[in-house]
Amino acid sequence: MVFVKSSKSNAYFKRYQVKFRRRRDGKTDYRARIRLINQDKNKYNTPKYRFVVRFTNKDIVAQIVSASIAGDIVKASAYAHELPQYGLTVGLTNYAAAYCTGLLLARRVLKMLEMDDEYEGNVEATGEDFSVEPTDSRRPFRALLDVGLIRTTTGNRVFGALKGALDGGLDIPHSDKRFAGFHKENKQLDAEIHRNYIYGGHVSNYMKLLGEDEPEKLQTHFSAYIKKGVEAESIEEMYKKVHAAIRAEPNHKKTEKSAPKEHKRYNLKKLTYEERKNKLIERVKALNGAGGDDDDEDDEE
């Protein structure tokens, strides 16, 4: 078979169109995005909200976002690095922390809309599937889950954040088959396993296992827990207190920043015209004075 080199003509380059920048960077799935933001044409000026969850190495970001021509508008946001204010100082990126972040965002956005008393959600997290029921006065706040580019595997942390938002009182279309504890064989959600994940039971079980088998590994893997005095038996109670604290005061707390430190100046301060003028006069006077002293010495000799 003869090898034929493919030649791109002038017309090819003339008609070539590059893909969107965020597609070229591999950051946005536009096929999924267009299905999330497309609004019915008979709904005018009605935003379609997305419940956006993203994970970094040390943080969890949860946002309520709506799309506009000018760009995406963030209505409310919650971060895992806010959780130490509510009593959770360790394990800020696991399934239980994702649940807390989703719960915090749900309570925050409902308080912003003055719907927090009307839609309390599921106060006691049992691990069972929960969907908010509409009341007679106002419909529940509806958003669509935006997972980005992650693999939506069963038990993924993003579904922990989803469960937190659902228990917080948001209306998000979902299925229970991706929550931790869902069995593929009998197609049923084991609520006890899911509850275990929500309250950090998987973390405490691993701590106990390492404590029995590999104490040295426990010291390295859970050094932050040991330093803060968090024990395996107290983890569930800690998360219960965090959930209660979030419901009590979900609003963002501004941190008090210390005054900036005054740095030593190494460059000379720029003088004004008057200061330069006075400095010159003083120098001239000093030179004249020095010249007069020399004349007096010559006369004495």
From Swiss-Prot:
Q: Give positions of region: Disordered.
A: 247-267
Ranges of Basic and acidic residues composition bias in the record = 249-261
Sorted alphabetically, the Gene Ontology cellular component annotations on this record are: cytosolic large ribosomal subunit; cytosolic ribosome; nucleolus; nucleoplasm; plant-type vacuole; plastid
The protein here is known as: Large ribosomal subunit protein uL18y
Compartments annotated for it: namely: Cytoplasm; Nucleus; Nucleus, Nucleolus; Nucleus, Nucleoplasm
Mind telling me which Pfam families this protein's record contains?
Ribosomal_L18_c, Ribosomal_L5e
One GO BP? cell division
* Keyword Ribonucleoprotein applies: yes
Which UniProt keywords are listed?
Answer: Cytoplasm, Nucleus, Ribonucleoprotein, Ribosomal protein, RNA-binding, rRNA-binding
Fill in the subunit field for this protein.
Answer: Component of the large ribosomal subunit (LSU).
Gene source species:
Arabidopsis thaliana (Mouse-ear cress)
What's this protein's function? Component of the ribosome, a large ribonucleoprotein complex responsible for the synthesis of proteins in the cell. The small ribosomal subunit (SSU) binds messenger RNAs (mRNAs) and translates the encoded message by selecting cognate aminoacyl-transfer RNA (tRNA) molecules. The large subunit (LSU) contains the ribosomal catalytic site termed the peptidyl transferase center (PTC), which catalyzes the formation of peptide bonds, thereby polymerizing the amino acids delivered by tRNAs into a polypeptide chain.
Changes seen on gene knockout: Moderate reduction in cell number. Abnormal leaf patterning, with the abaxial mesophyll features appearing in the adaxial mesophyll domain. Double mutants oli2 oli7 have further reduced cell number but exhibit also excessive postmitotic cell enlargement in leaves (compensation phenotype). Plant missing both OLI7 and GIF1/AN3 have a strong compensation phenotype.
Q: Which InterPro entries match?
A: Rbsml_uL18_euk, Ribosomal_uL18_C_euk
Stated family: Belongs to the universal ribosomal protein uL18 family.
| Gene name of the record | RPL5B
The signal peptide annotation in the UniProt record is: none
| Molecular function terms from GO | 5S rRNA binding; mRNA binding; structural constituent of ribosome
